Amino acid sequence: MTTVTTLAVANPGAMRAAAALAYAVTCYLLFLASFLAFAAFVGGLLPPPFALDVAPWQAAAIDIGLVVAFGLQHSIMARQGFKRVWTRIVPPVAERATYVLAASIMLGALVALWQPLPGAVWSVENATGAGVI
């Protein structure tokens, strides 16, 4: 005699909601990790992990490209037109978490790929000016 066991999901909507919540929590934890890495990097506690031996103009070009890519990702994904198209691919309930995931990946890439520049790029000598900044 063969016995067949079937697993029935009592409430598929609840399963989808739980999966969306788990996805969102994972995305926000990744954001926390990338933001903490960024804070440590800016504070001088984390050296650039992939610093290349390149000319200063090349390092500046890489850094500018990273900042532009980060800004473009934020700007494009924040637009209503993009969200309308994007929510045809990604469930609307996961749209914000996916935005956070993409931003976290971009921030992590910015930290990981940043190229140090020799010398001071800019400096404020005035104590009042430094306090304002």
Question: Predicted regions span which residues?
Answer:
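Membrane-anchoring alpha-helices and their flanking helix-loop junctions
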Residues: 2-133
